[in-house]
Swiss-Prot record:
Can convert substrates at high concentrations to desirable products in a short time. Thus, DCH exhibits significant hydrolysis activity, with stereo and/or regioselectivity, toward the methyl esters of bacetylthioisobutyrate and cetraxate, and is expected to be applicable to the practical synthesis of these compounds. The keyword Nucleotide-binding does not apply. Disruption phenotype: Disruption mutant is more sensitive to growth inhibition by peracetic acid than the parent strain. The sensitivities to hydrogen peroxide and acetic acid are not affected. Inhibited by the serine protease inhibitors diisopropyl fluorophosphate and phenylmethanesulfonyl fluoride. This is Bifunctional esterase/perhydrolase DCH.
Amino acid sequence: MGYVTTKDGVDIFYKDWGPRDAPVIFFHHGWPLSSDDWDAQMLFFLKEGFRVVAHDRRGHGRSTQVWDGHDMDHYADDVAAVVEYLGVQGAVHVGHSTGGGEVAYYVARYPNDPVAKAVLISAVPPLMVKTESNPDGLPKEVFDDLQNQLFKNRSQFYHDVPAGPFYGFNRPGAKVSEPVVLNWWRQGMMGGAKAHYDGIVAFSQTDFTEALKKIEVPVLILHGEDDQVVPFEISGKKSAELVKNGKLISYPGFPHGMPTTEAETINKDLLAFIRS
């Protein structure tokens, strides 16, 4: 564990576990979480002989709570800084939710940085918000409401999201895991309110269409069909049609936070793709 300082002076926290000569998997977390959200994957792939790396996005987790730069361009630049510092070119990049958008932007923005493969899990691309050119997207008012809830009572908001739609705990018959809810809350409250507030705009209004089209490496897209946060029909399904060399796996009944609730299945499919 340590920090990388970016060209604009932001300290980015990272984890780097495993043998230096092992194949590398670089994990990108979702909003408003941290690298801790990848525990189930990092421990699994460490045992499988990989070197695993994850960072806390600027303003998230243990990274600097800077007030600006909360957009996909800066997110991608921060990833590039970590990659260069650790010398982990040629990694497989795995992103969940907003992290999936970050992966797409990084791969497209840095074509000269070797990347082995990319994985988008419950990811926000190609575009979440409804526009004239994206009539199937979610109304902007949905994201305005997220910002309003964060502004009014961030602590309560960060309990309601994981206790409800994020893990599908609001579905009939679902068994709520309070420790999972509290871990989500803990990660969210570690980060900065300004970063999270601006991050809602970044993940909802960024159009990743051209970035997806530029990706040359193999891409695995994993998405739950019961994702209440990033609906499958407007995201994973469309992204699979935009990438040149993509594979889509959808999971009936799986929620947005499936890397946690369905870790065994997700890890198995990730491992098969990475080793293929």
